[in-house]
Amino acid sequence: EYKGRQTEYVDLIINEMIPMVAAEELADYIDVFCDKGFFTVEDTDRMLNAGMKYGLRAKIHANELDYSGGVQVGVKYNAISVDHLECMGEEEIACLLESETMPTVLPGAAFFLNMPYSPVRKMIQAGLPVALASDYNPGSSPSGNMKFIMSLGCINYKMLPEEVINATTLNSAYAMGVEEEAGSIAVGKLANFYITTPISGIEYLPYAYTADLIEAIFLKGEQY
């Protein structure tokens, strides 16, 4: 309906969709895909600004297809996370180093689309934290298997097992704004954890990428 009329569609989002979503308390975040062929930096700036006025925290999907400027506009609005990041240069890394925004990489999407992977080792060596997520969706990452995501982190990002576990737990909790209540086993936090079958060590989790190692799952202290 709005093909070729992107500005009008952005107006619709700002003037109708965001107010309705906020009024009905349907979302905590506003997430914009700022990338080549999708929303521009200017579009993204307008939508994040509108969402902020309604109390929606900014999140960004950006730099999957090109150096889009999405990282910079996300940091401008103190985005809780910027996701994808296959295209990352010195400018983007420096921008994130001066922010509280969590860089989140999505290896499942790069794997499924056969795209280049994010330069995670370069990001870590520069001093950035990194979160790992599945980007579970039917178009570009049709798997929510986080154990496989951990394996991809080790294989394709050259991350250590300890790094992928940290990236899928505490750093991922930070990327959702729930680090005070989840993401690690600590006094005062929710009892969210799983128990594995007997394994030789934590490095076996990403190593045995097709093995079903989960014996029990606990959410808020309740076993499922």
Where are these regions (language model features)?
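Generic structural signal for hydrophobic
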Residues: M20-V21, M47, G51, G74, ...
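Generic beta-strand/beta-sheet core signal
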Residues: F33, H61-N63, T104-L106, A133, ...
